[in-house]
UniProtKB/Swiss-Prot annotation:
Organism of derivation: Orientia tsutsugamushi (strain Ikeda)
Oligomer status and interactors: Homodimer.
Residues in CXXCXGXG motif repeats: 151-158, 168-175, 190-197, 204-211
Compartments where found: Cytoplasm
A single GO cellular-component term on record: cytoplasm
Residues the entry annotates as binding Zn(2+) 2: 168, 171, 190, 193
Amino acids binding Zn(2+) 1: 151, 154, 204, 207
Lineage: Bacteria, Pseudomonadati, Pseudomonadota, Alphaproteobacteria, Rickettsiales
Cofactor note (record): Binds 2 Zn(2+) ions per monomer.
Protein name: Chaperone protein DnaJ
Superkingdom: Bacteria
Length: 377
């Protein structure tokens, strides 16, 4: 049987980054998981090959050894060379050789092997888009996503009874296997028990001993009033389920605000544009504006208001998170000049322009006279 090319198994290049390897692994696991391919022996074999390849390539030391020496690096039969050149005659397990040399170290390793039997679930991130009104009032959303869920059949233990584990026959309870190439020893996570040091004699038929399985989850998320663009809501214990009773990860819901037709957001303030005519700007007056709640508000325009002037409506802005207060509503004034005039309107504008210019000239001449008069006294 030909040996697997671990890079081909995961569908990545030999220069792939760890992130690319991890992404490829997750994609393949979802595709060939037994829950999605019940009774498919080919899918079962592919999952085994995928796990084997990922176990080597995810570890930089193992990957480097594999790149240099290939599969021979991870074969226990490699110990034959060591025995032949040093007078050993059969029956010698590379594990025994390794433990004789590094016994104290491995003793410490064995004492912590239970850490491998439980694996914490990963934290998850979910992006959600809200309208500005939803962010203002707060909203409850139902989100749907694929993740690892705790197996109900075995309550996450991975076994169908409470006493179904035994020492792993491959690594003899150490959680690791050792191989030797020439004078070099290599240590790898045991493929049989995946580092746990024990195997399940009566594995759960639903999760295949994992204590979890992949499925779609629907979750109700309550989003508080006042969230902003980029706000992140942490839902403790709502992430990926742990393996064989491991701690469940957390879920982070990340907020994106959909652009609004009227308002833009700056901190807790809402900004909007208001068009007024030139006579209202000159004479002043009162106009009506609509806030984020849809309420109509009266806004006073001071006489002599200039273009791009900003007017503030206090407390009419965005809801402040975890507070009963609101920011301000900032109204930006745009003075609109008429594009066409009737004959009478044009005559009035010419008359007004003449009077304004005369008033301006009189004001200037008056200032000159006053200057010279005061200077001669």
């Amino acid at each position: 049987m030909s040996e697997l090319d671990y890079y081909q198994v995961l569908g990545v290049s030999r220069t792939a980054s760890q992130e690319e390897i991890k992404r490829a692994y997750r994609k393949l696991v979802l595709k060939y998981h037994p829950d999605h391919n019940p009774g498919d022996k080919n899918a079962e074999q592919k999952i085994k090959n995928i796990n084997e390849a990922y176990d080597i390539l995810k570890d930089e030391k193992k990957r480097s050894a594999y790149d240099q020496l290939g599969h021979q690096t991870f074969k226990n039969s490699g110990g034959g060379n060591y025995q032949q050149h040093h007078g050993f005659t059969g029956g010698i397990d590379p594990n025994d050789i390794f433990e004789n040399i590094f016994g104290d170290f491995m003793g410490a390793r064995r004492s912590s092997k239970t850490a491998f039997s439980k694996k914490a679930g990963a934290n998850l991130k979910y992006d959600i888009s809200l309208t500005l009104e939803e962010a203002f009032y707060g909203v409850t959303k139902i989100i749907s996503f694929k993740t690892a869920l705790t197996c109900e059949a075995c309550t996450g233990k991975g076994s169908l009874d409470n006493n179904s584990t035994s020492s792993c026959p491959t690594c003899r309870g150490s959680g690791v296997t050792r191989s030797q190439q020439g004078f070099f020893f290599f240590e790898n996570t045991c493929q049989t028990c995946r580092g746990a040091g024990h195997v399940i004699k009566n594995p759960c038929t639903k999760c295949y001993g994992e204590g979890r399985y992949i499925n779609t989850r629907n979750l109700e998320v309550k989003i508080p009033a006042g969230v902003k663009e980029g706000s992140r809501i942490k839902l403790t214990g709502e992430g990926e389920a742990g393996s064989r009773g491991g701690k469940t990860g957390d879920l982070y819901v990340c907020i994106t605000l959909i652009p609004h037709n009227t308002f833009s957001v700056d901190g807790n303030d809402l900004h909007c544009q208001l068009d007024i005519n030139c006579t209202t700007a000159a004479l002043g007056g009162e106009v009506e504006v609509t806030d984020i709640t849809g309420s109509k508000l009266k806004l006073k325009i001071p006489a002599g208001t200039q273009n791009n002037h900003k007017l503030k409506l206090s407390g009419k802005g965005m809801q402040i998170l975890h507070s009963d207060r609101c920011g301000n509503m900032i109204v930006h004034v745009n003075i609109k000049v008429p594009k066409s005039l009737t004959k009478s309107q044009r005559e009035l504008m010419i008359k007004l322009d003449k009077e304004l210019n005369e008033a301006s000239e009189e004001g200037f001449l008056s200032k000159v006279r006053n200057f010279w008069t005061s200077g001669s006294e």
